[in-house]
């Protein structure tokens, strides 16, 4: 197209002529008539005055309309040509008009360009000077620059189109005429019409008509000449003889050039063609060569099939190739004749400077003409240098089609070109006439070497085909398939994409390059082509280079590469689908050109791609392709070639064994190891879901994970759902998305595992007892795991014992049982640490700090938790997550402000900071201002109009205010409407407000929902306020359009739900009455849409003003069951969430414990607490679970919850069962079921329960003889303990008895503490408590049992007595020191009591009463009371004088501790008569103590209060008694006990809670007097101990002795309690137990309080002794003597009074009793 512009003709007639001559004649030479040839011959003399119409390659449009009979409109052709020319050569000068080939109008530059065009047409490879047709032709004459030859340019053109035409044009006028005569064998009349039509088209151009007519005529005859042999023969002979004159040759060359220019109109190619003036010379030879091809006379190309039609571009190329060949050998001097100095210099300049060729300036419009097209052709053959050269000799192949470069762009297959060239071209001629050989004036183009080198480049191209076959390289070329030549021209003439495509086939075949120079195109064209061919060949090897040379490789590439590309994408999927496609991997195409780089994939060597196409892709994408495959596939990495694929096939199995690291390396962009599967040689072994894919992939090599390599895939892990999703998202990784992360492990692990499986076969000894028939072969053994209560895990693995036999090389395996191991479940299963650290149960305000810390930790954990696991954010899930965090924050505020959310300024400020962060700092900028700023809308309130006012006025005049209101609304006079409606019914005012909100607020646009809801609340529309957030129509599922809605895009009707926070904040900041109704309504709305957390927040903020918000799941009115749990949508699973239960417990703690006006506990929550306790027990947190059980019992037994419907039999049964199991289970860190008592436990809450048992529960149990149903069965020996006479009940009696004397007192109902029943109850009850309460309970109950055990000992009297004596003697001391010692005697103490059983029987009634009292006393002493409890049987006195004696005893004990010797105290302790009196008191006390009916009750506070009271009373008594009875040592002793009490740990406890004196203190004083009267002994009003002793005397000595013995056992230390030593024992029988007389002085203080009660009972027991504790020492001995029938009696005697007992305890009971006697 640019060629036309160079010639100065825009009409395009020349192009049409070319089509007529090139297309029709070339393809259909038979169409031409002799007349046409004749006309051409005649017209050869016509001067070339219209070269302006330089032939252009036909445009695409022309190609479509290339009908020879009708030419397209001039304007169409011109426009198309102009466009192409401008695109190809933006810098090209305007087309030259009326310029001939010889002389071009314009600058010399333009002339040089035209010359170059001419050269391009002629293709001067030899450099002969007669090439330049531009210079050879004169502007005026239109003849060649060589004056000798007058060539008819039109004829030349016609010949050029037809190859023969070029020959005709090149010859001089005479020669042309001769030739014409020879050629014109057919009439041209037929063709004249066509020529005329073309001339008519070109009528506008000067001389164009004639010129084109000549051209057309010439073109047709040319074709005819091709058909006629004789003419061609003549022409051939003429050429061979060298008759053709240089001028003629130049002319012919010009004609040919013009023809080529037309055909080859390409941006850069034309430039080179234009620069080829030297081509004019070869054009002559071409003429000679072409003539044989075109002329029927001369058949220089017999190789061409006459009947075969060749594309004109092919024929043209052949002509060009042959021209230089013929010219060079035939006429070396022709150049001189043809070329002028100027022309030669210009050509030299053009040819000598390679840069000029590349520059755009040289790329002239004229150059773009035929030269560009020719260059393209040349480029194509140049790339396939060898192939093209060989094929180029036949001129016909390119000659016919050269005229149109656009046609070449049209997509002529390069393969076709190459093949045609191969057939037509004579490789020898091309070689002989290579451009380097024919360079004129000694000019050598730098491209000459490339021509020679072409064959060398061709071999590499050949290599490329093996790599990926031809397709891969072509794929690259295809990708750049035939870009406009102009685009390639810019890089350099060599790279015209148009030229590249034809050579694609050529480069692959690599024909000799020499033939390309032969082509008519200028050497410049050829040279650029060569350069392009080089990169293109390289491109083959590397996929990217292929892209660079798309044109050259295009023909070949398009075929294979396109399929390969789809294969890449499809292959990964198929591979992942476990389908081993034989086709190349989707990525193999890319690697095809770079098969050599394939080694790079070796890094992926872990999995060599199978020899099929897939192997190559795997190397690229799979983490570890086979190394060998990688070598081939490294190129495949870029793009896998078929060759690589084949190599991969062989390698895939080996590389699979490669390490996972290599697999990870597979894709640089894919750090993830998804390719691991590919690396696994034994993919089939992999069990994962991706394994099947691996199975197929094993052959295919690792799946291509290029897409799946992203780290995101690795995160989810193979089993994660996210990974599955990724697999689908990324087909390449779909194959192993899940296993991609596991792949590295699976690869290394599975492959070897698979290999190891067969190797692990063992030869088992088959059983013969029938087990061998077990299909599961369980006789081979299998691991066993068993989960036990309390978070223990039992496991055992079978052992395989080898057995060898003679003659056997390998042993046979005999499975046997393995070791059984236990471990806490926490070591096996992970736990949620934040939840495990919950500081529950929450029973006191002291837990507030811990609760706040825990809440903060949980909030931080929730905020830091990832919102999603798969990278996909679900809006609904995200909203719920945010709402959940807000809920926890609101609960924290509730705890911080002691259960108040509203009504407190601080609490409201905290809530505001939660609902609207930043509002505190920016009150004017945060949400409200932002809301106002974002509000937008076109609707605005209308100003009051006179018309509206008039209407309102009229309505008011008429007295119709309601009508006036709606008139105001209609006119949007809202102020008037509201003012008037306020005087009417409130409903009218609400309606007006609603209308105002709907039309004035909601219409404003966005972010008005919250404000509208607030206005509704102001209007009193509480329930309807939620309609502003979500319209009723939306809730009903309808889509409504508001007439008053503001402008803007429609929005989701449910979007208002996200405004709930702003709405709640507005309500809180603008409180009005009954706004809680709106909050509750908002909560229900949110709950209906699944926003449970937000709903619960609204309910909490609303409070309980509108009714309870918590309830059971079956309660339809309950808004909340568990905070954060949706019981509506998940009625059966909502309780599974532990967080919900714990958060609700925190709420309960804030409202019922921290609140100023505490509300009752949540009754429905207790069942959930019980479930939580079960969970804790399962995890091994038994102590926490037990605490929960106790807390639940305390709440259940409280008065406020007694009648709750939530407490039913099923609940109680579950609670009781869990409590018993926790007691039976070993305590933490202990393997025994008995917990060791400790001081901390003694001071724990367990004492409260112990006190409750002592007060009434134990008594009931004792009377029933079975105790609590669970109590008797608590311990492992509980049932045995049920028959104390048979053996000592393994209760905690001995060791714990000292601490648990109060529980044994319960047997008081049985009538005797010493009775076996009481013993049984005491031990079993104590173990129960000890278990439930850990060491504390155990410690407490054993003492009572100890007391009983003493009496029982008397039953068993022999061995047990000494044991008990020892135990008690030591126990009192040690009891206080450490209940653990008692624990050791758990049940034995009771057994020890058994020997004393007979005595117990005697004293049993007395014991009962003291026992009853003892519980109370024990409640006071707690720790020491237990020891005294052992003596409590003797403490009937205590029932009367409990408090009094306790006080005195305490002082006495401290003072009397040294006088451990007092045996009388023992005897006094034995005095049963006092017990009878005490029994009454004890009974009375029992009546007082029914409060503590159940062990479940926590009476810590009560116990402390009682203890304080008793202490106070005891102090008073001690002071009085010290002043009266102990004036001497008693006073000092009294002080000592005080000090001792302060020193003792019990004293510390009671000292803190010293409150009102207990009634018993008074009784103690009275008891001393009473005892004096009843016994007629021990009358010592001052000394309550003596009084107790007096009361004790009445009972028989023996009976008293056993009882006293048991008591004394507990009281042994009591002797020291007495100032004298005796009063102590009588006064504090329990005290003696706790502290033996000799060395237990330090303990008296605690014993005093705790022992007091025990001492009371002991005092009752040692009637005489207890009565006269101070004075009683002498009486005590008497009693002890009378009672001391045996050692047991002596031992029992130490039951002396409280005071003595307490002191004696520390010193040692046995010491006092035995030694005294």
Curated annotation (Swiss-Prot):
Gene3D superfamilies hit by this protein: 1.25.40.1030
InterPro entries the UniProt entry points to: Sec16_CCD (IPR024340), Sec16_N (IPR024468), Sec16_Sec23-bd (IPR024298)
Domain of life of the native organism: Eukaryota
Subcellular compartments: Endoplasmic reticulum membrane
Regions of compositional bias (Low complexity) in chain numbering: 475-498, 1600-1616, 1648-1658
Protein task: Involved in the initiation of assembly of the COPII coat required for the formation of transport vesicles from the endoplasmic reticulum (ER) and the selection of cargo molecules. Also involved in autophagy.
UniProt protein name: COPII coat assembly protein SEC16
Name of the gene this protein is made from: SEC16
């Amino acid at each position: 197209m640019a060629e036309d512009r160079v010639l100065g003709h825009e009409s395009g007639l020349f192009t049409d002529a070319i089509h007529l001559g090139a297309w029709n004649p070339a393809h259909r030479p038979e169409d031409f008539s002799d007349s046409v040839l004749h006309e051409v011959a005649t017209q050869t003399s016509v001067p070339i005055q219209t070269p302006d119409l330089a032939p252009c390659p036909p445009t695409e449009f022309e190609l479509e309309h290339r009908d020879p009979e009708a030419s397209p409109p001039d304007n169409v052709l011109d426009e198309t040509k102009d466009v192409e020319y401008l695109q190809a050569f933006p810098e090209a000068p305007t087309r030259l008009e009326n310029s001939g080939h010889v002389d071009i109008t314009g600058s010399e530059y333009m002339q040089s360009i035209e010359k170059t065009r001419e050269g391009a047409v002629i293709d001067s490879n030899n450099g002969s000077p007669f090439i330049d047709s531009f210079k050879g032709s004169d502007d005026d004459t239109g003849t060649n620059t060589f004056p000798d030859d007058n060539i008819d340019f039109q004829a030349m053109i016609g010949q050029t189109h037809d190859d023969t035409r070029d020959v005709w044009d090149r010859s001089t006028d005479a020669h042309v005429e001769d030739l014409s005569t020879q050629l014109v064998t057919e009439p041209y009349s037929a063709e004249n019409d066509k020529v005329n039509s073309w001339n008519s088209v070109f009528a506008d151009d000067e001389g164009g008509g004639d010129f084109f007519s000549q051209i057309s005529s010439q073109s047709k005859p040319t074709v005819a000449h091709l058909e006629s042999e004789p003419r061609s023969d003549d022409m051939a002979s003429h050429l061979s003889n060298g008759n053709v004159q240089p001028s003629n040759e130049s002319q012919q060359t010009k004609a040919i050039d013009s023809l080529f220019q037309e055909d080859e109109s390409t941006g850069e190619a034309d430039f080179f063609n234009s620069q080829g003036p030297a081509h004019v010379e070869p054009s002559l030879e071409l003429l000679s060569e072409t003539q044989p091809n075109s002329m029927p006379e001369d058949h220089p190309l017999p190789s061409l099939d006459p009947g075969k039609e060749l594309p004109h571009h092919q024929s043209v190329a052949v002509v060009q190739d042959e021209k230089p060949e013929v010219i060079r050998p035939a006429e070396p001097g022709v150049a001189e004749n043809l070329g002028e100095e100027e022309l030669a210099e210009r050509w030299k300049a053009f040819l000598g400077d390679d840069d000029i060729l590349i520059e755009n300036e040289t790329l002239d419009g004229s150059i773009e003409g035929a030269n560009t097209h020719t260059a393209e052709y040349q480029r194509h053959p140049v790339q396939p240098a060898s192939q093209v050269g060989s094929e180029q000799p036949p001129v016909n192949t390119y000659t016919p089609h050269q005229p149109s470069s656009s046609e070449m762009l049209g997509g002529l297959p390069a393969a076709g070109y190459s093949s045609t060239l191969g057939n037509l071209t004579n490789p020898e001629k091309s070689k002989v006439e290579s451009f380097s050989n024919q360079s004129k004036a000694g000019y050598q183009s730098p491209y000459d070497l490339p021509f020679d080198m072409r064959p060398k480049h061709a071999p590499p191209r050949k290599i490329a085909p093996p790599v990926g076959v031809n397709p891969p390289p072509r794929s690259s070329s295809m990708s750049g398939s035939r870009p406009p030549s102009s685009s390639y021209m810019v890089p350099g003439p060599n790279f015209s994409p148009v030229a590249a495509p034809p050579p694609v086939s050529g480069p692959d075949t690599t024909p000799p390059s020499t033939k390309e120079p032969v082509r008519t195109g200028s050497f410049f064209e050829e040279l650029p082509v060569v350069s392009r061919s080089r990169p293109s060949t390289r491109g083959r090897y590397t996929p990217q280079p292929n892209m660079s040379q798309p044109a050259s490789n295009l023909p070949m590439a398009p075929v294979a590469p396109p399929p390969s590309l789809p294969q890449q994408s499809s292959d990964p999927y198929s591979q992942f689908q476990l389908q081993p496609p034989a086709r190349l991997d989707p990525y193999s195409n890319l690697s095809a050109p770079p098969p050599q780089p394939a080694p790079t994939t070796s890094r992926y060597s872990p999995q060599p791609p199978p020899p099929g196409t897939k192997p190559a892709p795997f190397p690229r994408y799979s983490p570890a392709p086979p190394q060998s495959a990688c070598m081939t596939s490294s190129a495949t990495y870029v793009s896998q070639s078929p060759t690589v694929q084949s190599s991969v096939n062989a390698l895939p199995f080996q590389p699979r064994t490669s390490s996972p690291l290599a697999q990870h390396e597979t894709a640089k962009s894919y750090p993830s190891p998804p390719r691991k599967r590919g690396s696994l040689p034994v993919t089939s072994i992999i069990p994962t879901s991706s394994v099947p894919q691996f199975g197929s992939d094993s052959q295919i090599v690792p799946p291509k994970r290029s897409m799946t390599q992203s780290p995101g895939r690795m995160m989810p892990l193979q089993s994660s759902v996210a990974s599955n999703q990724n697999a689908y998202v990324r087909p390449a990784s779909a194959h192993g998305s899940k296993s991609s992360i596991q792949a590295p492990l699976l690869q290394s692990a599975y492959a070897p595992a698979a290999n190891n499986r067969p190797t692990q076969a063992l030869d088992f000894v088959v059983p013969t007892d029938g087990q061998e028939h077990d299909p599961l072969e369980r006789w081979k053994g299998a691991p066993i795991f068993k989960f036990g209560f309390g978070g223990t895990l039992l496991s055992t693995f079978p052992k395989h014992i080898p057995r060898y036999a003679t003659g056997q090389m390998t042993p046979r395996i005999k499975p046997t049982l393995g070791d059984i191991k236990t471990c806490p479940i926490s070591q096996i299963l992970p736990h949620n640490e934040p939840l495990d650290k919950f500081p529950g149960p929450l029973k006191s305000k002291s837990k507030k700090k811990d609760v706040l810390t825990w809440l903060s930790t949980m909030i931080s954990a929730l905020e830091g938790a990832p919102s999603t696991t798969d990278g996909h954010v679900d809006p609904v899930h995200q909203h719920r997550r945010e709402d959940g965090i807000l809920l926890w924050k609101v609960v924290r505020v509730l705890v911080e402000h002691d259960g108040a959310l509203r009504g407190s300024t601080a609490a409201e400020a905290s809530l505001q900071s939660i609902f609207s962060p930043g509002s505190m700092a920016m009150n004017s900028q945060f949400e409200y201002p932002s809301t106002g700023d974002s509000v937008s809308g076109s609707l605005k309130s209308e100003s009051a109009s006179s018309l509206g006012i008039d209407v309102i006025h009229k309505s008011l005049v008429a007295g119709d205010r309601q009508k006036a209101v709606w008139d105001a609304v209609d006119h949007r006079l809202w102020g008037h409407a509201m003012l008037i409606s306020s005087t009417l019914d409130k409903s009218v005012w609400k309606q007006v407000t609603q209308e105002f909100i709907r039309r004035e607020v909601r219409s404003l646009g966005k972010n008005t929902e919250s404000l509208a809801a607030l206005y509704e609340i102001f209007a009193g529309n509480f329930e309807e306020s939620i309609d502003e957030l979500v319209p009723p129509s939306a809730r009903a599922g309808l889509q409504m359009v508001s007439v008053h809605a503001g402008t803007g895009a429609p929005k989701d009707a449910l979007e208002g739900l996200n405004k709930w926070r702003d709405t709640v904040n507005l309500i809180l900041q603008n409180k009005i009455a009954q706004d809680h109704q709106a909050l509750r309504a908002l909560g229900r709305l949110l709950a209906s849409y699944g926003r449970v957390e937000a709903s619960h927040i609204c309910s909490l903020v609303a409070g309980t003003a509108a009714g309870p918000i918590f309830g059971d799941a079956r309660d339809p009115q309950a808004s909340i069951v568990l905070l954060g749990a949706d019981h509506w949508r998940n009625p059966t699973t909502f309780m599974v969430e532990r967080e919900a239960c714990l958060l609700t417990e925190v709420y309960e703690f804030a409202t019922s414990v921290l609140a100023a006006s505490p509300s009752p506990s949540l009754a429905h929550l207790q069942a959930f607490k019980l479930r939580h306790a079960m969970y804790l027990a399962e995890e091994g947190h038994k102590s926490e679970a037990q605490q929960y059980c106790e807390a639940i019992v305390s709440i259940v037994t409280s008065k406020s919850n007694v009648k709750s419907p939530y407490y039913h039999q099923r609940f109680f049964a579950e609670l009781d069962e869990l409590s018993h199991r926790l007691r039976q289970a070993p305590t933490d860190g202990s393997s025994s079921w008995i917990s060791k008592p400790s001081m901390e436990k003694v001071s724990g809450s367990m004492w409260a329960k112990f006190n409750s048992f002592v007060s009434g529960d134990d008594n009931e149990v004792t009377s029933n003889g079975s105790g609590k149903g669970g109590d008797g069965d608590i311990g492992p020996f509980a049932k045995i303990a049920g028959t104390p006479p048979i053996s000592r009940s393994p209760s905690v009696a001995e060791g714990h008895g000292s601490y648990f004397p109060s529980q044994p007192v319960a047997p008081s109902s049985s009538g005797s503490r010493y009775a076996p029943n009481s013993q049984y109850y005491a031990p079993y009850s104590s173990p129960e408590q000890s278990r439930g309460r850990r060491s504390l309970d155990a410690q407490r109950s054993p003492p009572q049992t100890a007391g009983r055990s003493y009496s029982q000992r008397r039953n068993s009297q022999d061995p047990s007595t000494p044991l008990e004596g020892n135990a008690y003697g030591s126990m009192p001391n040690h009891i206080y020191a450490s209940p653990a010692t008692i624990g050791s005697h758990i049940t034995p103490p009771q057994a020890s009591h058994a020997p004393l059983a007979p005595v117990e029987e005697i004293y049993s009634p007395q014991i009962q009463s003291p026992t009853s009292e003892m519980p109370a006393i024990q409640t006071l002493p707690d720790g020491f009371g237990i020891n005294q409890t052992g003596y409590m049987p003797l403490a009937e006195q205590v029932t009367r004088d409990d408090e009094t004696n306790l006080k005195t005893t305490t002082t006495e004990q401290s003072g009397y501790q040294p006088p451990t010797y007092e045996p009388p105290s023992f005897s006094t302790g034995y005095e049963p008569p006092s017990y009878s009196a005490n029994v009454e008191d004890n009974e009375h006390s029992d009546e007082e103590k029914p409060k503590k009916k159940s062990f479940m009750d926590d009476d810590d506070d009560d116990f402390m209060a009682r203890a304080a009271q008793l202490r106070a009373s005891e102090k008073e008594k001690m002071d009085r008694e010290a002043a009266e009875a102990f004036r001497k040592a008693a006073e000092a002793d009294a002080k000592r006990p005080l000090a001792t009490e302060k020193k003792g740990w019990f004293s510390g406890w009671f000292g803190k809670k010293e409150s009102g004196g207990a009634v018993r203190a008074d009784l103690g004083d009275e008891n001393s007097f009473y005892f004096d009267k009843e016994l007629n002994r021990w009358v010592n009003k001052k000394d309550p101990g003596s009084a107790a002793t007096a009361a004790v005397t009445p009972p028989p000595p023996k009976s008293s002795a056993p009882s006293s013995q048991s008591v004394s056992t507990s009281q042994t230390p009591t002797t020291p309690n007495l100032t004298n030593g005796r009063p102590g024992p009588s006064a504090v029988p329990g005290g003696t137990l706790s502290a033996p007389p000799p060395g237990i002085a330090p303990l008296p203080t605690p014993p005093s309080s705790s022992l007091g009660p025990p001492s009371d009972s002991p005092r009752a027991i040692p009637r005489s002794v207890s009565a006269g504790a101070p004075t009683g020492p002498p009486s005590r001995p008497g009693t002890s003597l009378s009672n001391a029938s045996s050692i047991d009696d002596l031992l029992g005697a130490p039951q002396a009074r409280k005071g003595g007992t307490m002191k004696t305890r520390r010193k040692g009971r046995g010491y006092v009793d035995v030694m005294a006697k």
